[in-house]
Amino acid sequence: MKKRMTIGAALLATSLALGAVLLNAAGPNPPQWRGNHKIDPTADIHPSVILEGSVTVGAYTKIDAGTVITGNVTIGHHSLIRCNTTIRGTNRIGNYTHIYDNVCIEGGRPAKIGTSRAETPDQSIIGDHCWINHGATMHGTQIADRGAVGLNGCCDYNTRIGAGAILANGSATHTNQVIPENAFAEGVPAVVKKENITDEDRLDYFGVLPEGWTTFEGEGQEKRARARQQKQ
């Protein structure tokens, strides 16, 4: 018996298919796009962005100048990737997620090949409403929904950051480190300094509430995209 597609999945598939048709109708992809890509027609991608491999970009997502994305990468809807970010390898990035300038994200290690301790391949998965601040570096890291990495934070191989947790500015994890859900971790190597943080704690630390800001900006990206469509 065939599985029924959810309404959301059906809409995404239809939107991506339409995007492929519109891109083809508009002519060849930019010369710096190499590979097989599925770009939603509402996505806003700067002309200088480099895409290689198989890259999927969802509705109303914005990717700024100088970004390089290579490999098998999926980016959800209403997300924001700022200037000069590098994403390579196999990566999955969720919806309404912000990745700021000069961030480096890589898929991580393959399964054990004699030169690493990885028993299974690392996974690079970033959830919804996540906040990856300027200059962060992440190797095969998993971040659950609403998780955050501060300015110049470093996540070594197979780091796992729980839902709503924060890795503080300038902090670094070691390989296989786990930061629990709603924990605040700081230092090199990072140590949990506070558990069960609240939105008030997040506001005090960041000055804005990441989930609220990513929602606000995502809605703005959609509004601007719709305005561009009306002018065409």
Model-derived segments and spans:
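A short mixed-secondary-structure module that forms the rim of ligand-binding clefts
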Residues: 78, 82-84
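Right-handed parallel beta-helix/beta-solenoid
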Residues: 69-73, 86-93, 119, 143
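Glycine-rich hexapeptide-repeat left-handed beta-helix
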Residues: 25-38, 94-232
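A structural connector/turn signal
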Residues: 34, 46, 50-52, 70, ...
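Bacterial N-terminal signal peptides that target proteins for export
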Residues: 1-11
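Extended, small-residue-rich solenoid/repeat segments and analogous flexible loops
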Residues: 5, 15-68, 74, 78, ...
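Residues on the solvent-exposed faces and adjacent turns
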Residues: 47, 53, 65, 71, ...
